[in-house]
Design a protein with these regions (language model features):
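N-terminal low-complexity, Ser/Thr- and acidic-residue-enriched intrinsically disordered segments
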Residues: 1-32
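A conserved cap/lid and substrate-binding interface adjacent to the catalytic center
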Residues: 24, 30, 36-143, 147
Length: 149
C-alpha cells in the first residue's frame, strides 16, 4: 500500500527548514539544521516532521552551479521508512543565495528553453528512481517540478 501524502505535508516539505536546508549554506545562513541523509555532525538531521508525520531523508542534492536544491524522503510507517512511497521535493529559487545565475540562466533558457536547473533536477530524480530499493510516488516543488517526469 502506498503512503498518501497530504497537501499540507508536501507544502511543509517545500519550506525553508526542510528542502532548502539540504543546502548547507542556506541552513547556516538561516540558523536551521542541515538536512542530510547521513548526519555526522551536530547541527545535521535526517528526520523531518511535517503535519505530525515523520519522514526520513534518503537523498539530497545541492548544486552550487545552478542553485538547485532538492531532497527525497520516505515516510515512517509502523516505525520503519516506507521506501515504496518516496517523495522527491525540489526547492524554489533562493533569492538570498550567493549563487548568482541570472545572466547564465537567461542565456541557457534563451538557447534551450530549459531552466539551467532542469538537468540537475532530472538527474537527481532519475538517480532515486533507478535505485531498486525505492519507488517514487510523489514529486513536489515549485517551478522545477513541472519539468520533471
Amino acid at each position: 500500500m502506498v503512503f498518501t501524502y497530504t497537501d499540507k505535508q508536501l507544502n511543509e516539505l517545500n519550506q525553508g527548514k526542510n528542502v532548502y536546508s539540504s543546502n548547507p549554506e542556506y541552513a547556516k545562513r538561516k540558523g536551521y539544521k542541515i538536512v542530510t541523509p547521513s548526519p555526522k555532525n551536530k547541527g545535521e538531521t535526517n528526520t523531518i516532521i511535517s503535519d505530525g508525520q515523520e519522514f526520513r531523508v534518503i537523498a539530497t542534492k545541492s548544486h552550487r552551479g545552478t542553485g538547485f536544491d532538492g531532497l527525497a524522503v520516505a515516510p515512517i510507517v509502523n516505525g520503519q521508512p516506507d521506501y515504496k512511497s518516496i517523495a522527491v521535493i525540489a526547492a524554489g529559487t533562493d533569492p538570498g543565495s550567493p549563487t548568482k545565475i541570472d545572466i547564465s540562466s537567461a542565456l541557457v533558457e534563451r538557447d534551450t528553453s530549459l531552466s539551467p536547473q532542469y538537468l540537475v533536477a532530472d538527474r537527481f530524480v532519475k538517480e532515486i528512481m533507478d535505485d531498486p530499493r525505492y519507488e517514487v510516488s510523489q514529486l513536489s516543488g515549485y517551478s522545477q517540478k513541472a519539468l520533471i517526469r
